[in-house]
Amino acid sequence: MILANDELKKLISTGRLKVDPLYPDTIRENGLDLRIGGEYAIYAYEGVVIKPCELESARHLFRVVKADEVVIPPRNFALLTTEEYVKMPDDVVGFANLRSTLARYGLVIPPTIVDAGFEGNITIEVVNETPNTIVLRRGMRFLHLVLAKTEGRAQYSGLYQGQRGVTPPKGLKNEC
């Protein structure tokens, strides 16, 4: 069941769902609009062969940029972080979607789940499918998070728990 704004307000007022900072326009009809944080990550190299199964960490492949503007080159992508630190209830899952206005400029994100029990800034991959450079601004609403109740409760203990700022991918060396 997708949670409407009245249910979201209840979860926030009881402290079960935390969104910090919480702006007047964060809570929408059927989800939360989240803002671009103060840093993003892009690949530091071009033409490199990346083998995730051989990496313990991929952080060295990325350059973290602290800026008020996010520059996404043509047919490239950037890892963006939310300004908001989010703490999800253990019985609510989030489905991240790019705001449709930004999608109309040619930006897309892959299907992204914010797990029940997750806590941290949310890192999202934003792909520029166009032949043009697209520049976004820190603080603009970019992500719409739809929340839904789960049957039962979850204990999230993933590597990204508690992440602050933009977080490049982990390596998959121990999973392949």
UniProtKB/Swiss-Prot annotation:
Residue sites binding dCTP per the record: 99-104, 115, 163
E.C. code: 3.5.4.13
Domain of life: Archaea
A Pfam short name: DCD
Reaction catalysis annotation: dCTP + H2O + H(+) = dUTP + NH4(+)
Classification via CDD domains: trimeric_dUTPase
Active site: residue positions: 125 (proton donor/acceptor)
Keywords assigned by UniProt, alphabetized: Hydrolase, Nucleotide metabolism, Nucleotide-binding
Keyword flag Nucleotide-binding: yes
GO molecular function: dCTP deaminase activity; nucleotide binding
InterPro entries linked to this entry: dCTP_deaminase, dUTPase-like_sf, dUTPase_trimeric
Pathway(s): Pyrimidine metabolism; dUMP biosynthesis; dUMP from dCTP (dUTP route): step 1/2
One record GO biological process: dUTP biosynthetic process
Role description: Catalyzes the deamination of dCTP to dUTP.
Oligomer and partners: Homotrimer.
Family: Belongs to the dCTP deaminase family.
Protein name per the record: dCTP deaminase
